[in-house]
Every structure is written in structure tokens, then in C-alpha cells.
Amino acid sequence: MRTLSIQGLPDKSRQKVLVHDWPEPEGPTGNEIKTETIYSGITNGTERNQLIGGNYAPKDEQLPTGGNGYQNVGRVIEVGPDVSELQIGDVLYMSAGHAEYIVMPEDGLLIKLPDSIDRKEAALFGMTSVAMRTCRNAELQMGERVLIVGAGIIGQVAAQIATGMGARVMLCDINANRLEIAEQIGAAETVLNVAGDGWGKEIADGAFDAVIDFAGVPGMEDQLISAVRQRGRVVFIAGRDKVTYTFNLGQGREIQLKQNSHFDRDDLQNLCRLVDRGLVKIAPLIRDVVPVSEAKRIYDTLRDTPDELLGTVFVW
């Protein structure tokens, strides 16, 4: 079957390409379902991390690997004998990789998509559900001042969800194009370009009840902590190998440091509900919808010039 495969290159760099002879998964048996992929979405941060050998990456000796992703929209083509809720023809979002066929238990990390949901938008339900999970984990309250750092897909959707929870959101980035999209969506109360010395000029000490970091810029931890009030919350989401900050800075403020892991089915269901009602907008974040045959070009861009991409959906 076709899949997207991470491969090592002679110069120790990596590429991700479409291959046509990957082993097809066995099954379905028991309560498993088998789907044929319609769309899959790139998870920009995680998949780039894997391409550059980061903390989420397979080791060199494990290459090549197949699939490697968690945003898949597919149609059920077979069901196991114990399947009770899903049927052939159902269209699902699944936390599964870039592969032509997927086999997964029907009680796995998936949801059945209503007909009213655009399937291309659903191909980004993984990253957008991370945004849902993060806002819930941050325990945002009505009227709280929240700084969201990073206007990629997750940050943009987190701004929408946090605003829906009643928070007063400032969304910042150094990418003017992404900030323009945020302005067009209109969820954040303030959209701020912090390129150059913008952070020092615009982000006041202790100005926020919570800071949510989707950017993962190395060495920025003290700046994030300085932006929260006494007993404020700092939520680290973007991938890091190590988190290093000045202990006395955090101690004096009695800060709370939080992380969260991925998302669950409840996050998916609530995200889907909000998208269906038009309360969360994904369409403005989709920049490229391309045949999966163009994967190498897309992943070379993700590896080398990641800011050129935003939402990318592969058509299978």
C-alpha cells in the first residue's frame, strides 16, 4: 500500500516521501475497523521534529518508518465481527498516520464525522484538538488575560477557544502573514508582532494570568514566566528536549508550570461540535491542499523553510 515514509540520507539528513510498497495492516479482527484514507493532514511541529532528529524523532537505526502522523480522515471499508457502532461507509477522523489503509479498534482515538463537517478541515482535527486540550488544561476563567505565543494552527485555534471560554486573548508571533490571518479571524482581542525588540516593548511584566506557549523557542522560558502574574500559569506545549528557567524567578511568583499530552475523544467531540456550529474556524488556516504524490516537496519545505507552510492537507 501507499504510505509516507521517513528515510535517512547519506549526509545524515532526512526526507519524507511517498512509497508504494509498504505492508498493508492486518485485520480487521474483533472490534477493529479498516478504513481507506481520503485526506491526511500534516502535523507541522511534530513531523518537522521527526525530520530534523528532534525529541519526538525515531532513531537513525529505526529508519525507514511509515505513517508518522496523527491526522487521518478515511472511509470504513471493512469491519470486524465484534464492531457494534460503526458501519461500512462511515467517514471517520482518526488519530492515525499518513497511510492508504488504517486498522484501528472502533473505541480508539477516533470520531465519526457528521455530513456537515468539511472533510479537509477534519484532516486538521488532531492539532486543533491539541488546542482544545490545552485551553481546558490551562483552566481559563472568564475575564482572564491570556497570552498565546505562536500563531500557527494550534495557537490560532487556541485563541478562538480561549475567547469562547471568556478569556481576553493576546496572540503574538513574529510571522506577519500568520498574524494577518489572526486579524481576519478576529478571535484574539489583541494581535501582536513581537519581531525584533517587540517582546520587550509590548509584553509587560506580570501582565497575564496565563501564558500558553506553542512556539517552543529555546531559551525563552524566563520571558514567558516574567509575563505572568503572581501564581500565574505557564503552559508549555511546543516540543522541547529540556526546559530551563531561573528558579528564583518562578519561586518568587509561585508560578504553576503545566504540560499536556495530546488529546482524547472528548476533546475531539467538543472540537467537532464547535466547528460544526461555526464557533471555531479552520478553513482560513488551510494553505495547501495537494495530492499526496507531492509529499516530498511539501516535506522538504517543512524541513528547510517551515514558515512557508501553515495548514497542509494531502488528497489520497
Per-segment meaning from a language model:
Residues 93, 212, 235:
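N-terminal Rossmann-like NAD(P) cofactor-binding module of classical short-chain dehydrogenase/reductase
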Residues 118-194:
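Mid-domain Rossmann-like dinucleotide-binding core that forms the NAD(H)/NADP(H) cofactor-binding site
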Residues 201-211:
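A short acidic, Gly/Pro-enriched loop at the edge of an enzyme's catalytic core
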Residues 222, 265-316:
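C-terminal hydrophobic helical "lid"/dimerization subdomain
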